[in-house]
Each structure stands twice: as structure tokens, then as C-alpha cells.
Amino acid sequence: MDLLLINGPNLNLVGKREPSIYGSQTLEDIQEELLTLANELGANLKFFQSNSEGEMIDCIQNSVGSIDGILINAGAYTHTSIALRDALLGVAIPYVEVHLSNIYSREEFRHKSFLSDKALGLVCGFGANSYQLALEGIVSYLKRV
């Protein structure tokens, strides 16, 4: 089972940017923990991070035929990008939306997601553990289909 975790804009700053909201673990630390968990779950996990919407779309499109499931934290693009939504729908790869913070307990403009209604699920608000929960969820789903 091959999985891809896509992180969007500013997530390269996790651990440094607003730690009271996003936590103190760096993206590299989170990814290291996820690799261990993925291995335990029998999954291969690849990582991609970009601040560019176009690069994220290219990554999604290039995943066809090589990736069984996607975990995506689109960052601020969650609330603005119909293009990311269209890319995810276009490749028809199951995906789980992930956020470190609870987007529904923050500013009103963060309450709208262009991704969640078509996702297998949405995990938010558990800090770095959101990624682990999302990983466990998508692996469980893919083992059943």
C-alpha cells in the first residue's frame, strides 16, 4: 500500500510558526514519526510539501497509478482552492483531509473547506496526532476495499 502525504503552504514552518496553534514539533519530526507508524501498519509513505498551489496539483496528478491513498493538509488552500479539489476528484484517489488545528474553532473564513465533502474523512484539532489518526484511518479503509 503506497500513500502520499501532501502538505501545503507554510507547513514547512510548523514548529516555528505560531506554536500555540500548530504545536512545537517540526514537520520533519512529524514525518519521522509517521514513517514509523506507516511501517508498523504495512504501508509505504511518501512526503511532499509546497507553498505553490500548482506544484501541489502536479504532485496529485503525477500520483495516478503509483499511489493508493492521499493524506492532505492543504493549509490555507483548503479554504480557497477549487483547483486542488478538482485535481483530487480528477485522479479519483481516496484522500483524507488533515489539519493540526481545529479549523472550526478558529476564524470564520477557515470554516469553509473545498476538500472535506469529497474526502473519506477529516481529522483536525489534535495537533501532530491528527496526521497519525488520518494515517490509521486511510490504511484501515484501504485494507477493507
UniProtKB/Swiss-Prot annotation:
Its lineage opens with:
Bacteria, Bacillati, Cyanobacteriota, Cyanophyceae, Synechococcales
Its recorded name reads 3-dehydroquinate dehydratase
Record HAMAP family:
AroQ
| Origin species | Prochlorococcus marinus (strain NATL1A)
* Pathway involvement of the protein, from the record: Metabolic intermediate biosynthesis; chorismate biosynthesis; chorismate from D-erythrose 4-phosphate and phosphoenolpyruvate: step 3/7
- Free-text function comment from the UniProt entry: Catalyzes a trans-dehydration via an enolate intermediate.
GO biological process: what's one of them? quinate catabolic process
What molecular function terms (GO) are annotated for this protein? Answer: 3-dehydroquinate dehydratase activity
Q: Does the keyword Amino-acid biosynthesis apply?
A: yes
EC numbers on record: 4.2.1.10
Among Gene3D superfamilies, the record links this protein to: Dehydroquinase, class II (3.40.50.9100)
Which gene carries the instructions for this protein?
Answer: aroQ
Which residues are annotated as site, described as Transition state stabilizer?
R17
Q: Which family does it belong to?
A: Belongs to the type-II 3-dehydroquinase family.
Catalyzed reactions: 3-dehydroquinate = 3-dehydroshikimate + H2O
